[in-house]
From Swiss-Prot:
Gene: CTAG
Subcellular location: Mitochondrion inner membrane
Keyword Transferase applies: no
Function according to Swiss-Prot or TrEMBL: Exerts its effect at some terminal stage of cytochrome c oxidase synthesis, probably by being involved in the insertion of the copper B into subunit I.
Sequence ranges on the Mitochondrial matrix membrane side: 1-7
Protein name listed in UniProt: Cytochrome c oxidase assembly protein ctaG
Membrane topology: Single-pass membrane protein
Residues in compartment: Mitochondrial intermembrane: 29-182
Pfam family, one: CtaG_Cox11
Amino acid sequence: MFKNRKSIAILIAAVSITMIGFSYGSVPLYRIFCQVTGFGGTTQVADLESDILTLKDEQQENRIITVRFNGDVSDTMPWKFHPIQQEIKVMVGETALAFYSAENPTDSSIIGISTYNVNPQQAGIYFNKIQCFCFEEQRLKPHETIDMPVFFFIDPAILDDPKMSDIDSITLSYTFFNVEDL
């Protein structure tokens, strides 16, 4: 009987530890899943040297797409966060640079991390970010304001996708979360 209680206690402890591990790992695992599959409008990350050089060699049409920017914060994140430009017009295959502004109005340092997506969702696989603040955590000191860049391009392969022929605007949206809440 004592062995059964000990086995049950070990089993309960193992299940509890596993559940806690899954809860901490779910956000990064979901982000990786979305990045690999393009699920949920997740953008692609470009390799600057290979992708940009390939783009310069490819014949590009003069198609212009309007990229709109959106910025939100979670309910528990006290930052003020917004895009500096509301929208820009981007020629397919050419790089573009946009900025978001984040302000920490509190009296303590806060570390934030952002999630992002693209709408319409099917455009996510063609939206390639070369450099982005979303690739790592951001620490803002008390009352600090920073401008954060997003360097990107829209893959010319979008021109070959018949489902994307009527798309003339894409929205890039970020939501910042307090790292302590994750």
